[in-house]
Amino acid sequence: FHFAGHAHAFGALSEADALRHRQVNFEATRALAEAAGEAGVARFVSLSSVKAMGEPQDACIDEDWPVPPESAYGQAKRAAEDALLAAGERYGMHVVSLRLAMVYGAGGRGNLERMASLVRRGVFPPLPETGNRRSMAHVADVVAAMRLVAADARAAGRSYIVAHPQTHSGRGLYDALRAAFGLAQVRWSVPRGVLTALARLGDGIEALAGRRVPLDSEALDRLLGS
């Protein structure tokens, strides 16, 4: 099972960042797959990302989605999948790539965990319902998928999306987190226009300070528009 990788970074990437994605997420995976094949490893399961495909916008997609990835991260992940498939064919190795949606679970340090921390403290704004949808996968389901594709010969040479069938809007996540923490339901929301203005203010602060702030235009788009 190959877990190692350079974490997805949002926003504009420098040339050094893009090179890092290629070196770690693609070239290192390719080298590891070749070494595994040379050593006679029978099965190799690699954790990829749904970002290895182009953005679906409002479409419900499967593994055959033809749109190529746009980001340096996604391109490196897709190249790693192709390299793994080539190694599998060359060495007769059982290879599978799992394209993970946003993963959550105990000990996580991603966007959902940061959102949960702010909701629990009562400082996360009640989002408006925009009808956006996000796919997610619990870490236990990811582990189950890894074990399944490693053991089933039918999975060899394939890439699979790993995501729960139920999707969530930003507001739906907010309400679910409040319920999980035993907090009262909030029946109002901050208007999208107000959040947009605050996000643009965050953009300006980032430009001056040279570091990310909790709310900028990109973060808002992920909450309301993805």
Feature annotation, model-predicted:
Residues G108-R114, P128-A151, G157-I161:
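Substrate-positioning beta->alpha
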Residues M53-G54, M93-R114:
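Flexible, glycine-rich beta-alpha linker
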Residues L148-L215:
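Mid/C-terminal beta-alpha module of Rossmann-like enzyme folds, strongest
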Residues F1-V24:
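NAD(P)H-binding glycine-rich loop region in Rossmannoid oxidoreductase-like domains
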